[in-house]
UniProtKB/Swiss-Prot annotation:
Residues 1-21 form the signal peptide. Its main location: secreted. Glycans are attached at N91. This is NLP effector protein 10. The keyword Zinc-finger does not apply. Induction: Highly expressed at multiple time points in both early and late stages almost the entire host infection process. Keywords: Glycoprotein, Secreted, Signal, Virulence. Secreted effector that acts as a pathogen-associated molecular pattern (PAMP) recognized by the plant immune system. Seems not to induce necrosis in Nicotiana benthamiana leaves but significantly improves disease resistance of Arabidopsis thaliana to Hyaloperonospora arabidopsidis and causes an inhibition of plant growth which is typically associated with enhanced immunity when over-expressed in Arabidopsis. The structure of NLP effectors is remarkably conserved with a high level of conservation of a central region containing the conserved undecapeptide motif AIMYAWYFPKD and heptapeptide motif GHRHDWE. InterPro entries: NPP1 (IPR008701). A motif (Conserved undecapeptide motif) lies at residues 129-139.
């Protein structure tokens, strides 16, 4: 007996949110984000326990782009939900995440090996865009009426400046996902949300009542830094693993992927066109 398409999709969401299926690889080339050396690093990566992923040590910044990413690195305050964890390690092994349960969830206070924030930068519409991305092993994000969260979740902030030169650039604006499927755009951010005109204070929080979602917003409370690694500083294996990772839940997929990166910049762009 052939199941209706909508029922197959519903079952798939239940399995991927709560069961053993944790990721699939993109097979549609129109939806894929190829690794730096196409065809060379597409072997399935190993999934390892969330607490065993070794973060990248923060490398020395060499280029202006890398220096700017360090200068504008936000401080993240965790009001509720999981703390950020490393998503991938140097050999391309990926975090297995944490199973979502509507009730009686285990705590996720951060990895014993340390945390990580990822970054990718480029020019977009005449502005220098610096994306920062944090990986959560699970998060509140309703996918069906019965499942209000899932394994794997990415939060991101885009910092908009006028130049990749950290010595002369100016913070113009910032964008980040809210809890209502919207994007907060601060143009410009108020001074109470910024330390020394460079460092944004960002809050990570959950909304259980109206929107059933995890999001970010600016705050006047300074949080913590995480070790930063930029897209180009990662190993080929790590970039390939992140680039080919795919889940049915949109927020579970790394915003650093080629296609997603520019999609996010387009939606997050805060200036008049």
């Amino acid at each position: 007996m052939k199941l209706p398409t909508f029922l197959i999709g519903f079952v798939a969401l239940l399995v991927t949110s709560n069961g053993s299926a944790r990721y699939v690889y993109r097979e549609d080339p129109d939806d894929s984000a190829d690794p730096p050396n196409p065809g060379a690093l597409h072997a399935n990566p190993i999934l390892i326990d969330v607490d065993d992923v070794q973060p990248f040590p923060q490398p020395r910044a060499i280029t202006d782009s890398q220096k700017s990413a360090l200068v504008y690195k936000p401080r993240l305050y965790i009001k509720s939900g999981c703390h950020p964890y490393p998503a991938v390690q140097a050999n391309g092994s990926l975090s297995d995440g944490l199973q979502w349960k509507n009730f009686l969830r285990s705590p996720c206070p951060g990895s014993p090996k340390g945390s990580q924030v990822y970054s990718r930068s480029d020019w977009y519409e005449g502005k220098w865009a610096i994306m920062y991305a944090w990986y959560l092993p699970r998060a509140l994000d309703r996918v069906t009426w019965l499942v209000n969260g899932h394994r794997h979740y990415w939060l991101w902030v885009v910092v908009w400046t006028d130049s990749p030169d950290p010595k002369t650039s100016t913070l113009l604006a910032t964008s980040m996902p809210g809890v209502a499927n919207n994007i907060h755009k601060y143009y410009p951010p108020k001074s109470k949300y910024v330390i020394r005109e460079k460092t944004l204070k960002v809050k990570s929080y959950q909304n259980h009542i109206l929107f059933i979602k995890h999001g970010l917003e600016l705050t006047d409370r300074a949080g913590d830094f995480q070790d930063l690694v930029t897209w180009e500083q990662m190993t080929d294996e790590a970039r390939a693993a992140l680039s080919t990772f795919h889940r049915p839940e949109h927020a579970a997929n790394p915003p650093l992927q080629d296609k997603r990166f520019y999609e996010v910049l387009e939606k997050a762009y805060p200036f008049d066109r």
